[in-house]
């Protein structure tokens, strides 16, 4: 086993598992989960989060993602309804169709077209275009969900979770960020694409002004932000 695998399995994986269990506790403590309700998991990948929250329920749960491969597992292995989304952020359901909309570490990726990620090197342009799409995505969540739970990593936490790297690099001009990510992807313990735009507390409150905002802590510091409407 090489050093990168050892670090991932011995340090980051146990930390991530503890963090996910903590997040499930927050969900159960703040959302009145309806056993027979309709639930939408936006960016739900293979559906593992829903399986951990509702181990005996598949009916009425919809998993959406932009990955056909992930949705194939969600449908054929885990038994969920699946919807393939495009990158626009539009959700193809009528108003208040779902009793609960769930989104975990997704909205920060609702930014620009994936094929333009490396081409947009202006920090201002990327932020403005990203925030416009994130705003539309947030409005869609509020439109289709009676209740919602939306989580996103906090921009000013000490470690940037997509790269597992000190978050100071986020304050560099985007052009340099892209070069740094390309360089680190050659050997670093975690690879990523510069397709994400992390949110500040004010950004997040602006997107979900009607919601209760929870600051999820790690080592006494705010690690992620959660918007809850119950």
Model-derived regions: residue spans:
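Class I SAM-dependent methyltransferase Rossmann-like catalytic core
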Residues: 1-32
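A short, conserved alpha-helix within the catalytic core of class I
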Residues: 110-142
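Conserved class I S-adenosyl-L-methionine
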Residues: 114, 133, 140, 147-175
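A conserved beta-strand element that flanks and buttresses the S-adenosyl-L-methionine
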Residues: 102
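Class I SAM-dependent methyltransferase SAM/SAH-binding core
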Residues: 40, 45-90
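Short alpha-helix
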Residues: 190-210
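Core SAM-dependent methyltransferase catalytic element
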Residues: 213-230
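Short catalytic micro-motifs in class I SAM-dependent methyltransferases
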Residues: 105-109
């Amino acid at each position: 086993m090489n050093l990168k695998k050892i670090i991932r399995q011995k340090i980051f994986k146990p930390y991530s598992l503890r963090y996910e269990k903590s997040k499930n506790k927050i969900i159960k403590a703040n959302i009145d989960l309806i056993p027979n309700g309709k639930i939408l998991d936006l960016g739900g990948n293979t559906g593992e989060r829903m399986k951990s929250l509702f181990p005996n329920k598949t009916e009425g749960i919809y998993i959406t993602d932009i990955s056909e491969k992930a949705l194939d597992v969600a449908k054929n292995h885990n038994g969920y309804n699946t919807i393939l989304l495009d990158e626009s952020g539009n959700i193809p359901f009528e108003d208040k169709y779902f009793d609960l909309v769930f989104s975990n570490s997704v909205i920060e990726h609702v930014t620009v077209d994936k094929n333009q990620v490396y081409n947009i090197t202006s920090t201002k342009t990327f932020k403005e275009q990203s925030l416009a799409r994130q705003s539309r995505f947030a409005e869609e969540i509020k439109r289709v969900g009676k209740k919602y739970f939306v989580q996103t990593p906090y921009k000013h936490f000490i470690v940037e979770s997509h790269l597992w790297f000190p978050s100071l690099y986020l304050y560099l001009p985007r052009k340099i960020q892209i070069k740094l990510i390309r360089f680190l992807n050659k050997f670093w313990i975690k690879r990523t694409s510069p397709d994400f735009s992390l949110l500040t507390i004010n950004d997040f409150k602006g997107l979900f002004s009607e919601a209760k905002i929870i600051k999820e802590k790690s080592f006494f510091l705010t690690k992620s932000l959660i918007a809850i409407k119950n």
